[in-house]
UniProtKB/Swiss-Prot annotation:
Its EC number is 4.1.1.49. Substrate binds at R44, Y178, K184, R304. This is Phosphoenolpyruvate carboxykinase (ATP). It is found in: Cytoplasm. Mn(2+) binds at K184, H203, D240. It is an enzyme of class 4 (lyase). The gene is pckA. It comes from Pseudoalteromonas translucida (strain TAC 125). The keyword Nucleotide-binding applies. Its cofactor is Mn(2+). Pathway: Carbohydrate biosynthesis; gluconeogenesis.
């Protein structure tokens, strides 16, 4: 470290905000949040993410377009270059943890070049009362957004990269201003490590009621994980990343990373109230009075708020609870043919978990050509799961079977027609569906079967118009509905051909005509 460079260790959020303002890294909003702009990368860069290929990962990773291999020697050389760059400038260090279960946490030393990225890290990771009390081997995360990679020299895809090295327990982020890369990289680390310990890592939100009734909400970004788990009547565990171990569900993080597009106090009061001093607002436009305009998408559809769980009044302080009674798969159906809620058998749960059918809504990935497009994302989070999909599906079924959890498919997308002509289910309707699920009011109820979709739908849900429950009722053109439903069933069938699973699971999905 040069004589003029300063290393700031374990600063408070207030101290970091002072540094961020002094360094010109962003602006303080009227509500007290710190607003930062991430430049041309306003989402994750999947083509720039790599995992170092070495003996411990060579035969365990599902290598391909998602998990791209990186040379170990190239990693060492680039890490050394970036580390030297960091040491020559002021930087920030904190001692944090990932995983709220004392049996399954990882200690992480986070080093960042900027103060605002450090606030993000302290918000999103766990700030323990006593760091690494079990003396677990620690990880290092180094985030240096102003470092410019040289692809020919460094072996990267572009001027920025995210590299995960399991053998050395290191994560390198260079040239990446989008802060979400930090949290997702450590999520990927836990997603690789936890299954070996018999723990299912999940891309889901979680909350728990007064009676200890835990509920999980799986889904891609924009499908409702954060909104639906932020329920004023229940205690929040977390909004995005969890582990399901025998006897417990625990948060992998210590904060929330909420989408801000069209955020309103009326529809999302918990999130609204959490955005205050200490919160990071990412790519949010301010008006002339520095009031956030959450309807302004001129920078991106993927504007975000990162805040610590302490900003949520009604939360589970321990960041963990018991095993779930209800498991909800959130799908945003752009074809408009899926019902608002379906009750899944164990086999159907496996089918839909592996399929991960949904839409990219205001995609979190850069380079998305459309703000809404359908997709199949294995385990409702394919970009973050390094092992083969079957590993996670088998663990899910094991947990569901052993604990007797009920599984539901909830459509937060369109009905009455596809995106563009149909109408999206409003938040109050989806909340009523979720309320019925978490309160146990859909257990053992009368259902009707939708043949082409192979789904069982309740004939009545408290607080929901019964005409909405069977989607054919919401379409004026019934023949057009049948056409779209058959097309979706065929898409499911085609997508599922890549999975080598039992006939019971294969036959639990939609039936291509």
């Amino acid at each position: 470290m040069t004589s003029s460079a300063t290393r700031f260790v374990d600063l408070t959020a207030a101290e970091l905000v002072e540094h961020a303002i002094r360094r010109g890294e962003g602006t303080l909003a009227a509500n007290g949040a710190f607003v930062a702009n991430t430049g041309h990368r306003t989402g994750r860069s999947p083509k720039d993410r790599f995992i170092v290929q070495e003996s411990s990962t060579e035969n365990e990773i599902q290598w391909g377009n998602v998990n791209r291999p990186f040379d170990a020697d190239k990693f060492d050389a680039l890490w050394a270059r970036v580390e030297a760059y960091v040491q020559s400038n002021d930087h920030f260090i904190s001692h944090l943890e990932v995983g709220a279960d004392p049996e399954h946490y990882l200690p992480v030393v986070v080093t960042t070049e900027t103060a605002w990225h450090h606030i993000f890290a302290k918000n999103m990771f766990i700030q323990p009362k006593s760091y690494n009390s079990s003396d677990v081997p620690q990880w290092q995360v180094m985030n240096v957004p102003s470092f410019v990679c040289e692809p020919e020299r460094d072996g990267t895809n572009s001027d920025g990269t995210v590299l995960i090295n399991f053998a050395q327990r290191k994560v390198l982020l260079a040239g990446m201003r989008y802060a979400g890369e930090m949290k997702k990289s450590m999520f990927s680390v836990q997603n690789f490590l936890l299954p070996a310990k018999g723990v299912l890592p999940m891309h889901c939100s979680a909350n728990v009621g007064e009676a200890g009734d835990t509920a999980l909400f799986f889904g891609l970004s924009g499908t409702g994980k954060t909104t639906l788990s932020a329920d004023p009547t229940r205690f929040l565990i977390g909004d995005d990343e969890h582990g399901w171990a025998p006897g417990s569900v625990f948060n992998i993080e210590g904060g929330c990373y909420a989408k801000c597009i069209d955020l309103s106090q009326k529809n999302e009061p918990v999130i609204w109230d959490a955005i205050r001093f200490g919160t990071i607002l990412e790519n949010v436009v301010l008006d002339e009075n520095r009031v956030p305009d959450f309807n302004d998408t001129s920078l991106t559809q993927n504007s975000r708020a990162a805040y610590p769980l302490e900003h949520v009044e009604k939360r589970k302080v321990e960041n963990r609870a018991g095993e779930p009674k209800a498991v909800v798969f959130l799908t945003c159906d752009v074809s408009g043919v899926l019902p608002p809620v379906s009750i899944l058998t164990e086999e159907a749960a496996a089918f839909h978990f592996l399929s991960g059918y949904t839409a990219k809504v205001g995609s979190t990935e850069i380079g998305s050509t459309s703000d809404i497009e359908s997709t199949f994302s294995t385990c409702f989070g394919a970009p973050f799961f390094p092992r083969p999909a079957g590993v996670y599906a088998e663990l899910l079924m094991k947990r569901v079977r052993e604990f007797g959890a009920k599984v539901y498919l909830v459509n937060t997308g369109w009905t009455g027609g596809p995106y563009g002509t149909g109408k999206r289910f409003d938040i109050p309707t989806t909340r009523a569906v979720v309320d019925a699920i978490v309160s146990g009011k859909l257990v053992g109820v009368e259902t009707q079967h939708i043949d082409v979709l192979n789904l069982d739908v309740p004939v009545a849900v408290p607080g929901v118009d019964s005409n909405l429950l069977n989607p054919i009722n919401t379409w004026e053109d019934k023949a057009k509905y049948a056409e779209y439903a058959a097309k979706l069933a065929a898409d499911f069938t085609e997508n599922f051909t890549k999975y080598d699973v039992s006939d019971e699971i294969k036959n639990a999905g939609p039936k291509a005509q």
